[in-house]
Structures are given as structure tokens and as C-alpha cells.
UniProtKB/Swiss-Prot annotation:
Positions bearing Phosphoserine: S45
Protein's job: Involved in oxygen transport from the lung to the various peripheral tissues.
Annotated positions of the S-nitrosocysteine modification: C94
GO cellular component: blood microparticle; haptoglobin-hemoglobin complex; hemoglobin complex
Assigned keywords, A-Z: Acetylation, Heme, Iron, Metal-binding, Oxygen transport, Phosphoprotein, S-nitrosylation, Transport
Subunit structure comment from the entry: Heterotetramer of two alpha chains and two beta chains.
Modified residues (Phosphothreonine): T13
Positions of modified residues (N6-acetyllysine): K60, K83, K145
Protein name: Hemoglobin subunit beta
Claim: ATP-binding is one of the keywords in the record: no
Organism lineage string: Eukaryota, Metazoa, Chordata, Craniata, Vertebrata
Family membership: Belongs to the globin family.
Residues holding heme b: H64, H93
The organism of origin for this protein: Scalopus aquaticus (Eastern mole)
Tissue expression remark: Red blood cells.
Length: 147
């Protein structure tokens, strides 16, 4: 596990408050499905995922991306208790959905890229480091039931 300093937690909380969470989530999930097409197998019920344009315009991808981003918001509000915050989601993804936990790390990396694109120069190297630590912590919490 990585350790986030109080300063890094503050950076994550502050910068997350500057983005449109719904848009960030939709873009991040869409990009995950485009860049890592094997992740599409978990979203068979989402309809047309045949091309990048179809994925990025898919209303079910956008809706689920929003849901994912709001879950990230919950984690950011509870950075000191991520395992507890994500316990039920970890169990769902492990026991019922059988999602490879590596996908959580991939989504976190995509999220960091989307944040960088949306925040521009404000997304400094220090901010990137703070968010990278946060997404690694979230991925570990989501993978907790797998161990």
C-alpha cells in the first residue's frame, strides 16, 4: 500500500471538486473500453461498443461512468477508510461479476490521464502523484475481497 500525506489528500479533495464528476467518469470509462478492449466483455448488455465513437457516445457507458465517478467521490470523502468504503463493491466485483482486479488499476490510470486532460496546467506533477496514489489505494480496496 502507498501512503498519502495529509497534503496529498488535500490536493485530491480540492482538485476533484473542480471537475464535473459526471463528465470525468463517463470519459474515463469510455476511454478504458477503447484503450483496453478486452474490458468490454464485462459490459455485454451495454449495446454498441463496436468503435471508439460508439463507445464514447453510448448512453449506458456514460451512465455507468457517472456511477463509477460518484463512487470515487465517496472514496475521496473517506480516504482514511477505503477498504470499508469499498467493501460491498469489492465483494460484488469479486463474487458476482468476476472482474479481474487488474482492471481497477487500469481504470485508475485512465482516470489520471482524463484528469490531466481536463485540468491542464493545474494538474501539476505533484497533483498527478497525489491522484496516482489515490487510484492505487482505491484499486487495492476494490481488490480486497480477492485476497
Amino acid at each position: 500500500m502507498v501512503h498519502m500525506s495529509a497534503e496529498e489528500k488535500g490536493i485530491v479533495t480540492s482538485m476533484w471538486g473542480k471537475v464535473n464528476v459526471d463528465d470525468i467518469g463517463a470519459e474515463a470509462l469510455g476511454r478504458l473500453l477503447v484503450v483496453y478492449p478486452w474490458t468490454q466483455r464485462f459490459f455485454d448488455s451495454f449495446g454498441d461498443l463496436s468503435s471508439p465513437a460508439a463507445i464514447m457516445g453510448n448512453p449506458k457507458v456514460k451512465a455507468h461512468g457517472k456511477k463509477v465517478a460518484h463512487s470515487i467521490s465517496d472514496g475521496i470523502k473517506n480516504l482514511d477508510n477505503l477498504k470499508g468504503t469499498y467493501a460491498k463493491l469489492s465483494e460484488l466485483h469479486c463474487d458476482k461479476l468476476h472482474v479481474d482486479p487488474e482492471n481497477f488499476r487500469l481504470l485508475g490510470n485512465v482516470l489520471v490521464c482524463v484528469l490531466a486532460r481536463n485540468l491542464g496546467k493545474e494538474f501539476t506533477p505533484h497533483a498527478r502523484t497525489a491522484f496516482q496514489k489515490m487510484v492505487l489505494e482505491v484499486a487495492a480496496a476494490l481488490a480486497h475481497k480477492y485476497h
